[in-house]
Amino acid sequence: MDGTLLASNLGFPEGPVVMPDGAIVFCDGNTGELRSWKDGALDTYAYTGGSPWGAVLGSDGAIYVTQGGPVPGSDESGVVSGIQRVDADGTVELLSSSIAGHTLIGPNDLAFGPDGRLWFTDSGSEQDFRFDVRVPGKLYVLDATGGGELLMERPEVYPNGIAFDEHERMYWTESAARRICRLDDGKGTVWAQLSDGHVPDGMAFAADGRAFVCTTVSGGVTVLSAGGEVLEEIHLGEHATNCIFAGSTLYVTATKVADIHVDQRTGTFWSVETDATGLPLIPGRL
């Protein structure tokens, strides 16, 4: 499986979503924007400010975003870490900046779960890939009333990407530990341990149970079996950050340099034609 470069000179792209009209909207953590790509044209979908990292499309047509706060090098003020909702007209609303008394520090990725709530990771750092910030990460859920709960606190492992498989089991990546974990009976278990140089970020499941995991440093996407074994590598030559399926096409956000700064423009956007069919995401709204 080979990748096709669709766009370049982006900031720090992350969190792609597939829109009903076929457009792909993704976050740009360096420019504070949601960007829209369709048929070769790249536009600004909305301005969130700060560092948007993850996104998921709600059944209400809104895009729900993890907001990491002001990007380094900017003069922004008033942008706080939290969960945002972006309506189709570009209106941005902060839904929550704390859960169950815990201030959100570095919300990273998110997905709707089978219970209708929004599940998300908080890496414990305001900015992506700050593994030197050794504070615990957390996993949270947010419900439609604005309430929520802390699912668990993780050690200094940088919880990152999150996804549900065909059995509606929740998985998340732990970048600093190079592993993917699964929630089993309320506890986190290690589902797959990756080798040196494979730092997992965002991920997407195929309908057959395979997991397509974006791995920075290694320069592409690592494909795992339903049992967690490495099957193959999709080499892009860049730090792959997140991905999403549209049918059998895997759309991947990436960056040549994993540097978060308002002036950095090394991000790229790719498509990969695969032999898989993407698993439909669980619908939800808040």
Predicted regions mapped to residue ranges:
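Sequence-structural signature of mature extracellular/luminal beta-sheet repeat domains
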Residues: 1-286
